[in-house]
From Swiss-Prot:
Disulfide bonds: none annotated. PANTHER family: PHENYLALANINE--TRNA LIGASE BETA SUBUNIT, PHENYLALANYL-TRNA SYNTHETASE BETA CHAIN AND LEUCINE-RICH REPEAT-CONTAINING PROTEIN 47. This is Phenylalanine--tRNA ligase beta subunit. GO terms for biological process: phenylalanyl-tRNA aminoacylation. Its EC number is 6.1.1.20. Its main location: cytoplasm. InterPro entries: aa-tRNA-synth_II/BPL/LPL, B3/B4_tRNA-bd, DNA-bd_dom_put_sf, Phe-tRNA-ligase_IIc_bsu, Phe-tRNA-synth_IIc_bsu_arc_euk, Phe-tRNA_synthase-like_B3/B4, Phe_tRNA_ligase_beta2_arc, PheRS_beta_core.
Amino acid sequence: MPKVEIYKNLFLDKIGKNFTNLEISELLEPFKAEFDGFDENSGKIKIEFNDTNRPDLWSYTGLARQIKTYLFGEIPYYDFFSKKGDFKKCYGEILVDNKMSQIRPFIFGFLAKGLIINDRMLEALIQFQEKLCQSYGQKRRRVAMGMYNSNFIKFPISYVASSPNHKFVPLGMDCELSLLEINEKHPKGLEYSYIVKNFDKYPLLLDNNNNVVSYPPIINSNNIGSLKVGDTELFVEVTGIDFEATLLALSIVACDFYDMGFEILPVKTVFKDPFGLDFEELVCPYYFQEEVEFDVKNVNRLLGNNLTLERICLNLKKMGVSSYSRDFKNYIVPPFYRNDFLHEVDVIEDVMIGEGLASFYPELPKAFTIGRLSALEEFSRNVRNLMMGMGFQEMIYNYMGSRKDFIDRMNINDQNFLKVSNPMTENYEYIRASIIPNLLKSESVSSNFPYPHKIFEVGKVALKNLDAAEGTSTFTNLAFLMSGKEISFNEINSIVATLFYYLNIEIILRESKATFYINGRGADILIEGFNVGSFGEISPYVLNNFGIFIPCSVFEVNINKLVSQS
């Protein structure tokens, strides 16, 4: 969850009233934020937010705006927003190459002037940029933001799909690199190039003098894209793959700049190929949010109160939300900087917060229900007890791992495995489809402990299943491993027979074709003709892959199928 540090004096100046740290802590509660401390040396307040629905609160200006509105009921208005059929005068243009529709289609921007940036303001802007791009922007994939000194930029700006060999000097360096070299050598390229590197061409922002402004969403130009203390005229752009998310991010930033004291000058984005949009140009910041209908009866039914329409509207006003009635229906108008009203329930939540959480008293439930464990959980607990009773030690593993451990070392193919599309590290690239690799990896680092080793886990596995709605199926499996000089197929067969005897389940065995077993020493487990698992002696080839030099036998069964058959 987002954590921010803001200067207390800047924050209180924007609210227009002084508060103690305890009072600030209490003011933060309605907005799902916690006071996490005050550093007297730096003068900063530390705040942690408990959800990501309100990115407009992640700056000192946005948070102060909401608290000020909550306390005094004054809804701020921003007259620089364009609306459908009412475009404001624009002061620059961004021309979008039609090839960008398949790469990173959306870019919107504005100009800001009239205030000299000081060091604290610059620090706050950079922090907010990082929080917005990392959390709301999903590590720049969904949304990324750039800020520049507009005095160095000649409009119109072109947003083009460029050759990977195009060169410029990236921010923080003093030599030219190609876009491909930036991906491979620059710290930001190494961190974020996964977003665009699979395309034949890369996004590039050029001004009218053909100077590189930035390589979004990776890095700005060192010549143009470096914002400094003392700058007074700025250009701000947001790129993204989601139309509404990109517009909202720009709207939030524009409102923040305005609240700081800047004048906001709109910029027009021109799409040469609208690729399905119902417009060819858009003047931004642009108000796109839709009104949401609410019913007074539904509000009171969910909250358990008896609020009047007037009281409801007053509570919404404290949250910065306008409302009106027309044709016996009630509607809210989302603020310029919010787009989290997806349903009437979201409106009711704001009414509740505006009314104050202390206004609602706990009530005993009117319906009596009895909770109990699911059949799967009861069965799993019984299995755990049986395994421990037979001398096995329970293990708990991570559900994610590497291709090397899950596939290559096991001598199997990857057709049923789920792969993470943009893993942070190859060690967590796949979702496990079996627990056996985890058990073998534990065994590979346990040779110093006395034999025999007997370990097990009851845990989740996930498989690719194109017939399922989500494309995957998740199961609970039981797997165990036995290792030692005397461990053989007969030993594990005895344990398997004992386990199913106490589970009161009849099984039939047939020879397994699994490639990680020794040929002829592996068995599939059938219940009423259905394959529910297997067991056997691990082949020397697989043992060698894991660095194990003592015989191992393993067992794995699908508990979901056992429950359905029991």
